[in-house]
């Protein structure tokens, strides 16, 4: 179980030129009060848009909206611990890996400390380049490792691929990439990229959030768990691959009558004790491309329903 004060870390991976930096800049522009900490190996490797920068010193860049960018150099874990010890702690840490880094190795390092946990690994691929990269004997192993360790795969630069391109058929028949989300200019809702933010989780807004919906690529629904649901079993059920859920987050009343926060992203799930009293309910997000509500109801029926 995740500690109640542990900070979530999203690892961004992807080969050189896939669109990682653009994804970071988009996240900063969409933060809307969420305090993000961007962690990079060297400042020179991340081109933060100038209009987002408020101040800069040797170790930290102050950004609009209370966000910050830090360089971790040779000691990533020390930098993570320093972020968690700030008086004004970030809500979420985004760690941009280098283009040739293996994200599962970064995740293993993060697991050595209790102050943070890996919330998700997001891998970006370049729609135009991915087939050539997977056939390149020098880089294929790296690209495959980045893809296989991902909870969410963003297939970027989709606007450059024609509708009749063989890429689409190749993607759908690929064992892993068939779940990739097509995006352009690394533009994706923050709900999808980082998870549903803390601002949405009051009793008065949980249903409004799901009703609001997303772009035409996604659906969202509120799931109402029964009383005294086992949070571990529910979190495991949410990661069933045939449900094609992108993310789920919410609260349940456990068998011990305590309130637990339950989250899932891709094949990853985790639970923690809620630090405040919350009403039971989860928001589920999936892609319309793989929408099957009959299958969803069947997979989750022992835990609750989609009507109050």
Where do the PLM segments sit?
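Flexible loop/N-cap segments at domain edges
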Residues: 284
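C-terminal accessory "lid"/substrate-recognition subdomains
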Residues: 145-280, 288-308
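Nucleotide-state-sensitive switch-loop elements of NTP-binding domains
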Residues: 2-136, 141
């Amino acid at each position: 179980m995740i500690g109640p004060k542990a900070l979530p870390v999203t690892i961004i991976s992807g080969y050189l030129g896939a669109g990682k930096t653009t994804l970071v800049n988009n996240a900063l522009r969409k933060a809307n009060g969420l305090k993000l900490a961007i962690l990079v190996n060297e400042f020179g490797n991340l081109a933060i848009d100038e209009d987002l920068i408020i101040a800069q010193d040797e170790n930290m860049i102050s950004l609009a909206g209370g966000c910050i960018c830090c360089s971790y150099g040779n000691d990533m874990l020390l930098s993570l611990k320093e972020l968690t010890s700030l008086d004004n702690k970030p809500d979420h840490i985004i760690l941009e890996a280098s283009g040739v880094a293996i994200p599962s190795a970064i995740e293993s390092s993060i697991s050595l400390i209790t102050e943070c946990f890996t919330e998700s690994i997001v891998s970006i691929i370049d729609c135009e380049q991915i087939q050539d990269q997977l056939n390149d004997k020098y880089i294929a192993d790296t690209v495959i490792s980045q893809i296989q360790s991902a909870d969410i795969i963003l297939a970027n630069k989709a606007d450059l691929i024609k509708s009749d391109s063989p890429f689409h058929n190749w993607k759908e028949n690929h064992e892993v990439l068939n779940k990739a989300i097509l995006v352009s200019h690394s533009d994706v809702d923050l709900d999808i990229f980082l998870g549903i933010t803390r601002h949405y989780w009051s009793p008065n807004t949980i249903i409004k959030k799901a009703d609001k919906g997303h772009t035409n690529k996604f659906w969202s629904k509120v799931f109402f768990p029964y009383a005294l649901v086992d949070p571990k079993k529910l979190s495991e059920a949410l990661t069933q691959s045939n449900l094609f859920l992108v993310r789920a987050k919410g609260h349940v009343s456990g068998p011990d009558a305590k309130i637990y926060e339950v989250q899932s992203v891709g094949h990853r799930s985790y639970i923690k004790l809620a630090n405040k009293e919350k009403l039971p309910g989860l928001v589920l997000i999936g892609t319309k491309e793989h929408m099957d509500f009959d299958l969803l109801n069947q997979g989750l029926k022992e835990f609750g329903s989609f009507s109050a």
